[in-house]
């Protein structure tokens, strides 16, 4: 698959190019990746992209799909969770459930300051508008994830982002480069129906809060149940933003666009 597009050494060379050069070189590969199934995409990535590999997961509503999809081909792949300390009790229970069911190699990373210490220093950042939310996300999600990628020596990062989830994800490619790491999104073009059928076929569950009306689940204080007329992205961060920062490039010219 895709052998005519780029060899493994040629793919590795992409990491040395500027962002613009990376995007141009990756465009042709992405055209062909779009023609493959999610399982074929994962197989290609494991055979051709830079290791070590890892999957990031928030253990959200549809998390079981990506965790199952990738561990079927690489059972021992590290699963990185950034634990803010403010997850729902049901999320922690879901983590334990999937860890046992799929025998996950779970790696948990947290902020260097505890949740209580952060509140003592900064107050409740999530109540301080967009700037407070961005600071909260940087402390609790972005820094721990970058530390995880560094400590796990990750060369290729798998994520379960889907274009259908929000406008900010609608144009994402399957393969990109984010902050010097290959970013691979094998289910980026899946619909909610595709997700549902996969879960049913493989005996997997939605997050427990799915049945209570949640379409997206993160921290307790910035996740809302869906109500008629709301988009999925409006159920997070009070509708002020969709992304927590994990899947945003740092903006440097050397790194490609990117969980």
Swiss-Prot record:
GO CC, any one term: cytoplasm
Pfam family of the protein (one): PAPS_reduct
Active site location: 244 (nucleophile)
GO molecular function: phosphoadenylyl-sulfate reductase (thioredoxin) activity
SUPFAM superfamilies: Adenine nucleotide alpha hydrolases-like
Reaction catalyzed: [thioredoxin]-disulfide + sulfite + adenosine 3',5'-bisphosphate + 2 H(+) = [thioredoxin]-dithiol + 3'-phosphoadenylyl sulfate
Primary location class: cytoplasm
EC number of this enzyme: 1.8.4.8
Location in the cell: Cytoplasm
Metabolic or biological pathway, per its Swiss-Prot or TrEMBL entry: Sulfur metabolism; hydrogen sulfide biosynthesis; sulfite from sulfate: step 3/3
Lineage top rank: taxon: Bacteria
Gene3D superfamilies named among the record's database cross-references: HUPs (3.40.50.620)
Gene Ontology BP terms: hydrogen sulfide biosynthetic process; sulfate assimilation, phosphoadenylyl sulfate reduction by phosphoadenylyl-sulfate reductase (thioredoxin)
Entry keywords, A to Z: Cytoplasm, Oxidoreductase
HAMAP family, per database record: CysH (MF_00063)
PANTHER family given in the database record: PHOSPHOADENOSINE PHOSPHOSULFATE REDUCTASE
Function text: Catalyzes the formation of sulfite from phosphoadenosine 5'-phosphosulfate (PAPS) using thioredoxin as an electron donor.
Family: Belongs to the PAPS reductase family. CysH subfamily.
Protein name as annotated: Phosphoadenosine 5'-phosphosulfate reductase
